[in-house]
A protein has these predicted regions:
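Conserved, mostly hydrophobic/aromatic
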Residues: 19, 43, 91, 105, ...
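Active-site beta->alpha loop and helix N-cap motifs at the rims of alpha/beta catalytic domains
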Residues: 66-90
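N-terminal amphipathic alpha-helix/helix-capping segment at the start of soluble metabolic enzymes
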Residues: 1-18, 133-140
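Active-site mouth loops of central-metabolism enzymes
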Residues: 12-24, 145-156
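Conserved small/polar residues in nucleotide/adenosyl-binding loops
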Residues: 204-211
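Conserved anion-binding
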Residues: 78, 93-164
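Active-site-adjacent beta->alpha loops and helix N-cap segments on the catalytic face
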Residues: 46-60, 75-79, 97-110, 127-132, ...
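Short, acidic/polar
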Residues: 21-32, 75-81, 155-163
């Protein structure tokens, strides 16, 4: 199972242990990689590090055959392109608020004609600086895990359609921002928050029951 990607393991029904990386210390990253986690998320949205710092972290982790995911700073196509180019195993995009934004995130991850990601395969860490150009698009389709965060009332209202967007692998609830959007910052026991949380969770409970 360890030889499978996170995406493949999740599809097989495996339960994985992951952690967030907020400290941009290569030594801390090495310790984390040796601690038995299945995956990790390098946080560029709220963490203090830059994209260059993320590369250093990934280099430290790669010595232990550990490939992390990255939370991007936003869904801006230029941001997404630069994150993908350094070669994470997956990416989380914060605060996707509508079906169109979800579609735009998917398109930003794909080369033409299916998307609008800029192509420079010989220059990318993601392709081994040109060593693994052949098959990279297939790897992206089969192994790369694309996660979007649901953090607003607008997203909850459109959750059925957002979840149906082809190319989105996972929804991840951002509880603090979601509670703020609902006018109940940090009030996780409020009716507004519980109703929104249950609406998202029941979407997947219903899918499982149908199967």
């Amino acid at each position: 199972m360890k030889n499978l990607s996170v995406k493949q393991q999740l599809r097989s029904g495996a339960r994985l242990n992951g952690c967030w990386i907020e400290s941009f210390s290569a030594i801390a990253a090495e310790i984390m990689a040796m601690s038995g986690y299945d995956t990790a998320m390098i946080d560029l949205e709220h963490g203090p590090g830059s994209l260059t710092d993320a590369v250093v972290m990934m280099q430290a982790l790669s010595a232990h055959q550990f490939k992390p995911m990255i939370r991007a700073t936003s869904g801006d196509p230029a941001v997404i392109k630069r994150v993908l180019d350094i070669g994470p195993l997956g990416m989380m995009v914060p605060n996707v608020r509508s079906v169109q934004e979800a579609r735009d995130v998917v398109a930003a991850c794909r080369y033409g004609p299916d998307g609008f990601r800029g192509a420079a395969p010989a220059l990318l860490r993601a392709t081994g600086y040109g060593e693994h150009v052949t098959g990279y698009e297939q790897w992206m389709a089969e192994e790369f895990l694309l996660i979007i965060q649901i953090e607003s009332k607008e997203a909850v209202d459109a959750i059925d359609d957002i979840a149906a967007v082809e190319g989105i692998d996972m929804l991840f609830i951002g509880p603090i921002d979601l509670s703020a959007s609902l006018g109940a910052l940090g009030q996780f026991d409020s009716t507004e928050f519980i109703d929104a949380f249950e609406k998202i969770c029941l979407l997947y409970t219903s899918d499982a029951a149908d199967e």
